Amino acid sequence: MKKIVKSGPGSAELADVADVSADTVIPEYWAEACRHLVKKDRVMKRLIPQFGDAHLQARGDAFSTLARSIVGQQISVKAAQDVWTKFSALPKKLTPANVLRLKVDDMRAAGLSARKVEYLVDLSIHFDTGAVHVKDWQSMDDEAIIAELVAIRGIARWTAEMFLIFYLTRPNVLPLDDVGLISGISQNYFSGESVSRSDAREVAAAWAPYCSVATWYIWRSLDPLPAVAAPAEQ
């Protein structure tokens, strides 16, 4: 279960950042995870208070989340938003069956490459035929879900891990292929020196079983402005 925070209108800079100024869904483990990380990790003890009530925000439905990740591959954020707006407006409702009814020419006209059209069709087929077990995901472990997702064209492990974090809000995902995570670990733990996957795993050993939460704070540490001024070191 997740709890709902109701408050006044507001917005966040990124889709995955939320604060108490918006109606948001907080993963039920978030507070406990923060307590654990502050206790176990010196960097988390410094970072977490800087961002106040900001937290990970779960994203839309499974199909559109994965479709959007495909649309956004290898293009800028602005370009991805423009293409997504055009593509998602093509069907009356964005469902696997409706995407399969779209004409390739119309999808290309929305700004999609031929390869991305193929990927979106394959994604739609997997959902439409039940090749992915959406209703079973809540009871499946992370690696089993990743195995299902990477069988879809255009979805590699990193995309599957982002899906676990931002859609399924799994608490203990460590996306070692994520450039931002590695960069953040380098800056926060190694004074900017080069970091290997082994180094990252060693750092993350203290984060378990809340690697997703720690990763989220590492990402936030790379943002230009924290939500709250950093407290003085004790």
Regions found by a protein language model. Give the residues of each.
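Alpha-helical ds-nucleic-acid-binding substructure associated with the helix-hairpin-helix region
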Residues: 24, 43, 75-76, 80-153, ...
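Structural motif
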Residues: 56-64, 111-115, 204-211
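Alpha-helix C-capping/helix-to-loop hinge sites
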Residues: 54, 69, 73-74, 90, ...
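A positional/architectural concept
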Residues: 25, 32, 38-69, 74-85, ...
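Short alpha-helical scaffolding segments that buttress acidic/His motifs in well-ordered protein cores
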Residues: 66-71, 120-124, 163-164, 214-218
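A general alpha-helix detector
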Residues: 65-70, 102-106, 144-148, 180, ...
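Non-catalytic interaction surface on structured domains
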Residues: 50, 58, 62, 109, ...
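C-terminal accessory module of base-excision DNA glycosylases/AP lyases that mediates lesion recognition
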Residues: 1-54, 138, 142-143, 157-234
